Regions:
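Extended hydrophobic/aromatic-rich secondary-structure runs
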Residues: 118-129, 148-150, 156-157, 162, ...
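Zn2+-dependent cytidine deaminase-like catalytic core
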Residues: 31-137, 256, 275-277
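Proteins enriched for Cys/Gly/acidic motifs involved in redox and nucleic-acid/cofactor modification
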Residues: 20-21, 48-49, 132-161
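Helix-turn-helix
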Residues: 28
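Short low-complexity, flexible loop/linker segments enriched in glycine and/or proline
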Residues: 116-118, 142-146, 212-214
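Enzymes that bind and transform nitrogen-containing heteroaromatic metabolites
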Residues: 1-25, 40-41, 67, 85, ...
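Hydrophobic, well-ordered secondary-structure segments
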Residues: 117, 135-142, 183-190
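Generic secondary-structure signature for well-ordered alpha-helical cores
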Residues: 12-19, 62-65, 122-125, 143, ...
Length: 343
């Protein structure tokens, strides 16, 4: 039970790397002394910089170094055993003579899976593993990383807002469906993805800014890291600076794979969203449920011929309803990653 508490802490630390560590996985580590005191902790912040284990061990005060041979390190992902931009973390744990290492989940990739465990045990470090429920959470945390490497495409999230009577918009005007509070949820989703895509019609009709101002208004660096794509045949003069256009989904996904972008948020409109759904190119979907029907400014129902229906998810996929920022969202998860990779 005590092990679980520290692994929970490692998981929480790992999640802090969501906006910055891609294309690397999120990893957290906690060093615990023989008396149960946390001696040091850390997480992987960004590629090329210290891994979680390095940061956690570097956080241990000099006066606590003598405690390391009786201490345990908790790591959410198997410590690496290969030389890349940084030395192997497993070798560092051995070098610092830690007594024990508790691992959240084994590296999911066959060519490196288990090698960190082997290096640790050969170096005299006791190795234990988190229970199944925590193992699943450690894997799920890195679903974007796993999706890109196993499926050869980014993790794809669909997101839209729909009126109570099932419409996403109108052909001649914008519908106000989200509240200022629920927009924060959408911007948080944007911040957790490396790229956004909308259709040509959405670009022309809505002139969206596609930034994260409602979630992290001062995060200029994060806005610059966000790739913005338009799906459709778009003239150069129509594209805002820094945005890119692709005529086909396959071209977009191939470009993202080349660029090492692990996650894509698809925001609309209906035609674009439905294209991803029909090709089974989605891993997660969020649909905000508006509280009003599609009405004009005077409260009258709009003619049906002016309305654009919301996308239709396959009936075989069930959804959960969750409350975020005071609004109900329907949430779907594709079984693909769970069935094939244990997520």
């Amino acid at each position: 039970m005590t092990d679980n508490i520290y692994m929970e802490r490692a998981l929480l630390l790992a999640s802090h790397g969501l906006l910055s560590c891609a294309p690397n996985p999120m990893v957290g580590a906690v060093v615990v002394g023989p008396d149960g005191r946390i001696l040091g902790e850390g997480y992987h912040i960004r590629t090329g910089e210290g891994h979680a284990e390095v940061n956690a061990l570097n956080a241990v005060k000099k006066e606590d170094w003598p405690l390391l041979p009786e201490s345990t390190i908790y790591v959410s992902l198997e410590p690496c055993a290969h030389y890349g931009k940084t030395p192997p973390c497993a070798a560092l744990i051995v070098k610092r003579r830690l007594k024990r290492c508790v691992i959240g989940c084994i590296d999911p990739f066959s060519r490196v899976s288990g090698k960190g465990v082997e290096m640790l045990r050969q170096g005299g470090v006791e190795v234990d593993f988190a229970p199944e429920e925590l193992r699943q959470r450690c894997l799920h945390l890195n679903k974007r990383f796993i999706c890109q490497h196993h499926l050869g495409r980014p993790f794809i999230t669909l997101k839209w807002a729909q009126t109570r009577d099932g419409y996403i918009g109108a052909t001649d005007r914008r519908l106000t469906i989200s509240t200022s509070e629920s927009r924060m949820f959408g911007h948080r989703l944007r911040a957790s993805h490396q790229a956004i895509v909308v259709g040509h019609n959405t670009l022309l009709q809505d002139a969206p800014r596609l930034d994260i101002r409602h979630w992290a208004s001062g995060s200029h660096r994060r806005d610059e890291m966000l790739g913005v794509y338009i799906l459709g045949r778009v003239g150069e003069e129509e594209l805002p600076h820094g945005w890119q256009a692709f005529a086909h989904i396959d071209d977009l996904l191939e470009n993202m794979q080349r660029e090492g972008q692990q996650s894509l948020l698809v925001e609309g409109g209906t035609q674009v969203l439905q294209s991803f759904i029909e090709r089974d190119l989605w891993d997660e979907a969020w649909a905000e449920q508006g509280t009003n029907d599609a009405l004009d400014t005077e409260g009258h129902c709009l003619p049906e011929e002016l309305l654009v229906a919301a996308p239709k998810m396959p009936r075989e996929f069930s959804y959960d309803e969750e409350i975020h920022f005071g609004r109900t969202f329907r949430h779907w998860e594709s079984p693909l990653l769970k069935e094939n990779y244990g997520l």
